[in-house]
């Protein structure tokens, strides 16, 4: 938030000093239908952390905390947000405002226990019945850190590299309280397949590299992982594949096309098979519909204009100016909202993704391909992308799973499938079984 520091200072000046309130404890409330819990402590200094259980997010550390009488001010840099609240006379409620671009009224009430962490029955727990090794490998001047797992029995194993979706993620592809790659690696290794999963650039033990990295740059990281597997004597170098989720699926396609002698098979989990711009336009429509707020014709036209503007851009400064002009004309957006959106949409990664066309690579993919999608995936639409996969890769095995979302989780309804963190299952058991069966069928 550009003026967050000033806003924080002004809120402090507006505070009313009264009595010494008791803010220490656990406080629950709801912001935009999402339950949240603040944990407030004071051991000589104030400390606040935040949980969003439904999103699977816990222990989000807050920044500066100021308490003056009955008023508390909490800065949340990780969320680009501020909370200001006034405690009731009985110390049982806090009446406040959650400010994140817009101001949302919220009432916090005391709770005697911390937010319940959702059960994750598939998350692997030691002791493991296979070998696990922390490893590093290099891609030029970038060091990537990961975990290599292999079965105890056998001397040379089929192997896969796991490649995560968009956004910097750790080796477990940890999101919404789930660890999909940890679950996949555990399942595959228990069934005789070696697995290498690694931290994305700038996460965990991996070095950051350039801020301008695009999908094509990240594809070279995945190939460095393949090269690492090829260097190991315990790997069957004629059976090394890439399993990519979302953007990672596109990376698998790119590397299968450009390194046909090194990539023996690929599996795309909700991988894009159409242009990035078409993915994003469809995603916007589906997300709005599933949230019960379908786009009007004018809103749909605005979305398309923004994406087409990015696709046609050749200069980042001019693109930012063009996006600013479009957004200023399409609604009541705050300056903060506009600038945050432009920062994302004019970034090298986003621009490159919009322009990236899998059709450039798909005709060159000759290795075996398993393309998988869930029917309730609103981020990478199954009909749109599996249809393209069938058309461009007639030799591919294509599977659509009814009632599964972008993470291949089952849910009770299409709308509920959007709440990844609220679903206990990390990934469908049937999907895991099909992956193992398909890999083992590759001779």
Describe the predicted segments one by one.
Residues 267-364:
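Accessory cap/linker subdomain of secreted extracellular hydrolases
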Residues 404-408, 412-443:
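Catalytic active-site module of serine/aspartate enzymes centered on a nucleophile-bearing elbow/loop
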Residues 156-166:
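Short beta-strand element of the alpha/beta-hydrolase
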